[in-house]
Regions:
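Penicillin-binding protein/beta-lactamase superfamily catalytic region
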Residues: 134, 150-192
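Charged/polar, low-hydrophobicity segments characteristic of intrinsically disordered regions
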Residues: 48-59, 103, 141-164
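Short, well-ordered surface patches within globular domains
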Residues: 54, 129, 133-134
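Conserved glycosyltransferase catalytic-site signature
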Residues: 15, 111, 129
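Active-site-proximal loop and beta-strand segments within enzyme catalytic domains
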Residues: 1-108, 116, 186
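Structural preference for long, well-ordered alpha-helical segments in enzyme cores
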Residues: 21, 113, 132-135
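Bacterial peptidoglycan biogenesis and beta-lactam-recognition machinery
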Residues: 23-30, 118-129, 137-146
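Structured segments of extracytoplasmic/periplasmic soluble domains
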Residues: 59, 88, 120, 134, ...
Length: 192
């Protein structure tokens, strides 16, 4: 690990998504109170027509998980621009928690949805990764990536997962005893 290493920032990337959308708002191209389907008509399919940009950003889209498998190749920039992920999002219905709450953390899916929205509104049709590279990294001399190309792979630090025994043990701890994992293994399994 060195000063030029690239490490996964996981959910900290949501701040980059917010910056990208705020850029569109500042240009008058996007409004948080508008429906996502006003910018991306196909998104309104499967009962999602009333969902606003603000709902999406507050993790209230009802799209916290998809009931389909995503081919990792579909996440490559050229496939994103061919609407591989967008088509999945368009056809997917909303699904809310059993407790009736509309809010559920969209750990992975929000980034995909926001990226699809962004690229449809951006005058150049860029992905958020391209926006960060061109409009943030260049002017600020930053070194941030959403998606890396082959030239940067040697700089990427691999993610080392916590040992499964630790995860299992922590998942069984009652919340009152400082459980560090949101759901225990049985709650997670019941949602699959």
């Amino acid at each position: 690990f060195g000063s030029d290493s690239i490490s996964n920032i996981f959910s900290s990337g949501k701040s980059l998504e917010a910056i990208a959308l705020a850029s569109l708002v500042s240009q008058g191209l996007l409004a948080y109170d508008k429906k996502v389907s006003e910018y991306w008509p196909e998104f309104g399919a499967a009962g999602k027509g009333e969902l606003t940009v603000a709902d999406l950003m507050r993790h209230e889209a009802g799209l916290a998980a998809f009931k389909v498998s995503i081919d990792p190749k579909d996440l490559l920039r050229e496939n994103i621009k061919q609407n591989k992920i967008g088509a999945i999002i368009e056809s997917h219905p909303q699904s809310f928690r059993e407790n009736g709450s509309e809010r559920e953390y969209h750990a992975v899916t929000r980034g995909w949805i926001v990226n699809e929205l962004f690229r449809r509104i951006d005058p150049e049709g860029r992905t958020i990764g391209q926006f960060i590279s061109e409009d943030v990294n260049g002017p600020l001399g930053a070194d941030i990536f959403i998606g890396v190309d082959e030239t940067h792979i040697p700089r990427v630090v691999p993610v080392t997962p916590l040992p499964i025994r630790y995860q299992f043990k922590e998942s069984l701890k009652p919340s009152i005893m400082g459980r560090r994992i949101e759901r225990n293994i049985f709650q997670t399994a019941s949602r699959l």
